[in-house]
Amino acid sequence: MPVSLAVCETTTTTTANVVNAALRESLLGGSRSGAAVAGSGSASSLISGAGGAGASAANDDDSSSTATANTNLQNQIVASAKRVLLAKIEYEEVENYNDSVLDNLKTKYVVIKSPTPAAAAAATNNGNSNSAGSKILGANGHDNRQKQQNANGGCSTPTTTTTQTSSSSTSSSSIEHNNNPNELPKPKRVLYQRENIRIGWKQSERKWQIGAGMINVGNTCYLNSTLQALFHIPALANWLNSEQSHLENCNIGGESGGGGGGGGGNNGGFCIICAMAKTLQSTQSNASAIRPYHIYSKLKQICKHMVIGRQEDAHEFLRFLVEAMEKAYLMRYRNYKELDQLVKETTPLNQIFGGYLRSEVRCLSCNHVSITFQHFQDLLLDIRKSDTLDEAFDGYFSRERLEDMGYKCEGCKKKVSATKQFSLQRAPITLCIQLKRFSMIGNKLTKQISFKPRIDLSRFAARSPTAQGQLPLTYRLVSLVTHLGVSQHCGHYTAIGLTESGSYYNFDDSYVRPIAMQSVCSTNSYIMFYELDLNQPLATPANKLNGLRQLSNGHHHHQQQQQQHQQQQQQQPTVVATIASSPMATTRFIGPQLPPGGLNGYAMTTTTTATNNTTNGHSQKTAIQFKPQQNGILTVGSGKFQESGQQKSPLVGTNHKNEAPAVAPNANANANGKSSSNPNTNTTINTNTNNGNSNNNNTNATTANNSNKLNQQQQQYLPMSSSDEEDSDEEKMKRPTTTTPQLPSMPKMDGGGDEKPKTLTLTPTTTPTASTPTVSNPLKRLVPYESASEEEESSSGTPSSSTPTTTTTAAAAAASSPMQATAAATLPPPPTPTNARKRSLPDHHHHHPHHHVMVNGHGKSPKPASMPPATNFNSSSSKQKTDAIDEIFKSLNNFNKKRINNKNQKHNEGDEEEDDEETLEKETNNSSRLVSSSTNTSPTTNGWKQSQIVSSSSSNSKNVSTSAAAAAATTSSSTSTSAPPSPKTPPSPAVINSKTGLWKVTRNLDDDDDEEEEDEDDEEHIAPTPPPVVAKTHKNPFSSQQKPTPSPSTEAAPKRQKLFNGTSSSTPHVGNGYQSEPSTPNGGGSGSGSNGCLNELLKQSHRGYGSSSVLSWNGKQTELDKEPFELVCAKRIAVDHGDHDDGGGGDDGGGVGVVTTTTTTTTTTKNTTKTLTADAQEQRQRDLDDDEENEMDRGRQRKVKTATANGKSSGNSNNTTPGYNPFQEYESQKRWHNKSSNGPPRFYTQHASSSYRSNFHQRNKFKCNRGGNGGGGSGGISKFDHRHGLQRHLAAGGGFPRRPNANQQQQQQQS
């Protein structure tokens, strides 16, 4: 309560000094009586000086009657007393007599012997139970925790305040604070008590409106936005509203106005506080926009260099405005210039915006720590290396290293290297944050910094009792200032403020409109104001500490035991006060840090709080934070709730007037200012947990009622928690017991056993007898692509005649743990369970399309329900891989030998049909498991879907082949005719990657007539439906497919199929993209000795760019015979050009096989290839315009064919050098050096030879045999006439043309 205190002028102090001098003179030579009289006189003078005229008159009478011996002393005393009586005495109102008077008196005394800690504790216990703990743990000695909790809603009891400040804090606490260098020093005088700051809109007596806009009077957007941001800070608005009495005094008396604002006038003068209060009232009372005249008219007094009409910085104006308000408040005191800095930092503005940073500098040599404290009113955060506000805070409070040898250590007494780190010693009530967006040269950093409406700074609190004794540092966003513009010298300022209703509004000068929370958090903010949120954090420590105390005392659930426990706590108030009033342990509950009490006691608090709920209104916070404990982890849930509260419920605690969603009515009563009716018997536990509504006689009833309130409040707060946390509780009731515990914050795994998987029944007969195999050591592949045959072999572990089965047991087990199923799929499981899993798991993905199982690092999309379910798992071992490959190669060898014997009967339709049928029978017999109907799956290899035939009959009969072909035509993916597209850059031959491509190799070695006759039996292969799987094959230079060329009538119906080595079936050149010269058997030395070069190519083709059937998985040479390819290629050229007598030989060019020489195809091949070479050169000349746009792949630059295989075949060959590397020849001799061949330079003109055209890109690969020695024949001229439109499609199947011979180069240069 206000106390009138007499304050004497300077003359009073001078008179007292004269009296003291007179006393000293008399005592030196005076008698005992004189000393006694002097003592009484001194006392009388002091009393008269402080008491009044009546007391001094009485003392004068006594002194005159008894001072007969010392007349001189008497005269001096009388004269001094008269001066004191005549002196003018002014009275000043003080809020606290103890702090203003008694604390000043303490400085006049010297403590002879400091009390022991036990005596201090005893003195504290004899006083108030909460005094010592509150005073010690308060904010720097003047922030009383007990008073702050009560004063937020009203006034505390005078007895508590007087006892706290007089007894214990005046003796030992202040001395401890002043003597401890690691603690913030206590100010000698507090101008404005911190607990008087009213936090939140509900603490005010008035109803706060949204606020009117402010008119821009000329580049004053910075002023308008700053004022709007300040007026929407509840603490500042409440304080300005409480200055009504000062506002009236400034208007009435010029002296008061002069004292408040410097003597400027009768209407407020220069008092900027009055100007702010008037402007605030104008915004609240007017519905239309106002002019902030009281502020911009005093702009020169606020800041001397600011001019009206000029653009200014909003943060600079904010700092000058707050400083001017502080100065105006200090000028209310006559001796404000004599106040020290700590006292000046206790003004209302500093109590609202001010805080203290603790700076710790640690020497790296002697580990000496130097601690200093720094006052701040805003934090300037560097955002150059941050994208979020939390990252900026982490960078600000992180430990930084001082420059080497630049810090002088107090311990080492020398310059050493050190580290420096900031922490929050005392956090401000309103935190002002400025993002450093502007540089010294005026540039602006316009990056987006994301922030949350609620932040927690508890993790940055200093490790000191005072810092730990603060409230949990949870802040909510109340206002911010944004800047729109690209530089400091231009732009526009706007403000966003939080109103009492809990909604945000955008204030753009005179325009005021609501804004959504998402828009607020996405703004390009410049200055942000966060205010302490006392409602939400206060409930959390009370509940948690309540649980800790009950656990430590054995779970008291009865009224009598609680009363006994409360009496014990009242007898030992020091410990309880430390725990209850100091959230020393509770600050660690917010954020990632754990409480000092440990997790063991915390894990059992849920049951205690739910059954014996003594918290009345705040138990819902505990219920939410303890909710994740049901899943087994409590700590994650606490931090999770905090994060969800910041993200999903930013406005919790803002609608303070209603208060129903956040606090129960009992707690609301305390918030309105009602203190405990029985403070003596009510202990600290009841004070903190029940918030002043403790009635020990009604404990049981309160517990029952609060348990119901707890459930209701839990339901109200459930939407605040994150969605996955809610799902975890709901799914826990549905799903079976999971094998591994899952944290609430962890994302749910794919499948995750959410629901029972539904398997797709392929046939009416189901055999749910299989069981999921146990996975012990999953195998890892060295090659990231699946083999074509390994899945077929592993999936066809059952007999080939078995019907498709679905195993629901294995499906459910695999779906419940998809990660185990994925690992299990990589092992060689039993036959039946493997098939069951391959059918059930993909079907589970069909029902859950968002769950894609990853195989080899690629996500697989589920197939539609109409198609066979796709398996995405590798289910074979390396041994199965080798066996399947060997079987396929054996079947290929047998077929090749068969084809060599029948090569003279290629135009006989009946013979070709029989050969084809026999070949199919051999293939199906050797790889019967490949055609098994139990593998009705289309495996996905590295993101490329592959198809597989579906057959239900036995694979040992010929009907299997025909039915498989029919099914393949239906699904556009037959295992005997179509091949899947292999990966774009396969690391190994494509024939092994694809299970169907191998079949196509054996089938597609037939010539055109063979296919025409075969189409009569297998009509499905020429179905006009374009196969979707083969659509991507033309982009793959390593495809192992070889589609048989259909008849001319049906040639354009299906999409183009690739040959075995990557070329199109309609092109004469067979190769893997490497154009070669004609290697005719025994034909003028053009191909007889090409084995050396081809073998060299075959040895290096395992790098992924060579042929698709050169090397096996173990790196050995395959057993595949290469003769049929040469014959087929020669025949295809002859057939397409009208030469049906004999097939021409052709180098396959892709390193597929060894060229065999035959005397029957020499002349035809020479004539054909010469013509084709001429046509190819003409086409290349026409494509020179697209040279630079279609450069070849740099990864294949080093691969090029030579002119001939080795020097044996032709004298024109220039690669007879031993150790010749055909892969390096193109790079070293042809393109770059270009010295040995004397060819044109790299960038040649169109007049140069067109044979160099194909060296630049892969687009023009003509799959033709170029003239090796300039010789050739006739025929095949029309080969390219109807293929020109398709040649640009052959980029994926081509490589580089062969280097021309020396004769060709000379001829081309001459031409």
UniProtKB/Swiss-Prot annotation:
The lineage of its organism: Eukaryota, Metazoa, Ecdysozoa, Arthropoda, Hexapoda. It catalyses: Thiol-dependent hydrolysis of ester, thioester, amide, peptide and isopeptide bonds formed by the C-terminal Gly of ubiquitin (a 76-residue protein attached to proteins as an intracellular targeting signal). Keywords: Hydrolase, Nucleus, Phosphoprotein, Protease, Thiol protease, Ubl conjugation pathway. Its EC number is 3.4.19.12. The active site is at residues 221, 492. Residues 1267-1276 have a biased composition (Gly residues). Residues 120-134, 156-174, 560-572, 605-616, 660-716, 759-774, 795-826, 925-942, 950-979, 1037-1050, 1154-1176, 1204-1221 have a biased composition (Low complexity). Disulfide bonds: none annotated. Belongs to the peptidase C19 family. Residues 880-889 have a biased composition (Basic and acidic residues). Residues 212-533 form the USP domain. This is Ubiquitin carboxyl-terminal hydrolase 36. The gene is Usp36. Residues 980-989 have a biased composition (Pro residues). Residues 910-920, 1006-1020 have a biased composition (Acidic residues). One of its GO terms (biological process) is proteolysis.
